[in-house]
């Protein structure tokens, strides 16, 4: 049952939020369990939560897939709807429980804009109230860090470049509307959906530029999606340190952002069984610049999918934090921004971090030569792809067995068409009057553009999900006719 048909808060405050996010964020209100010099190692775990928006409600209304699961309990694993809902709110129970036991728990939370809107649509005050507590309560701020993302779980490499910033901004609008500007000001880390990092020079440069302009200070990346400047993979020790991800576009311009490295592949058991904690317990400080810093194991997993996350994670989370409380021996839980802030306070900034780049850049820039131009880059990519079929500039993610581009022309071409139509209609108007983004027709068209870019319409193969995409595309085009 949809309780509200109100559109999501995805636009209208662009300049205001950009200005807000250039302010310095207040640090965590609670000190870590140990001073930096006493920390031997640490781990940072993130939970990724997402439910897509689909045109499957009454008369084709846009509803959360969580709502669809509740309405159709006999299909597939839809009987898990309420267990999923519990997963979306349970950290508001687990964190205070462990604090009460004398533990110092930490968790990072990555909620898609779709899901935040969906639980609002559904009137699930149990979930929104729990998230508001985690985002706004002064005590929780030292234990819980929210990560930003794209609003509709788009994957960056196949998202039209002009829409990267729209996706980032829409999520910030949604989060601020639900939890307030002060809570948004604390969101400084970014979790790209599917850990999908673009490796096309212009896409990556635009992505990192949009993140930096939007106030993000660091990015979570998958270890196999990046390389060192010489093309070599990251060393094991390097994966346990912050790195400096440099993006260079086809004109030779460069921009950088701090990257924390998610190791290994897509396996919810890694977080579900708190493997990062037990890995960190066996690690020591590592050299960085002229000093040493705590090794940091960084990991993310779906927060609700699968029996391990639904059933085993809560007790594993408790056991790990009790173990640290009783016999941590210099190993603690930290959140990403907290770890980087401690390094910064100790005089260790990103100039000391190892420099990395997106995978494939070394081969590309060697082929381009010393005078990069868009034409030279395009020609070099074509030569490399012809000589080596495994060379690709789509990007890289934790699901390299799945292509987000190949075989989905019937989704990607309409998506590019809708994006082009949207920008042709509204960009000239926005140049004249930025407040046009407050208009209902702008926001309705933007909503359909963002929704069409949802990865789920490509993840599950041809059929119902691509039909959903077709419906959203048709409605979006009609709005722009």
Language-model features, listed with the residues they occupy:
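Short, well-structured secondary-structure segments
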Residues: 40-47, 52-160, 183-192, 217-222
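Well-ordered, non-membrane alpha-helical segments in soluble/globular domains
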Residues: 78-95, 123-134, 164-169, 202-207, ...
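Acidic, His- and aromatic-enriched active-site or binding-groove loops in soluble protein domains
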Residues: 127-145, 168-173, 207-227, 237-251, ...
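CE4/NodB-like, metal-dependent polysaccharide N-deacetylase domain
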Residues: 164-194, 250, 284-299
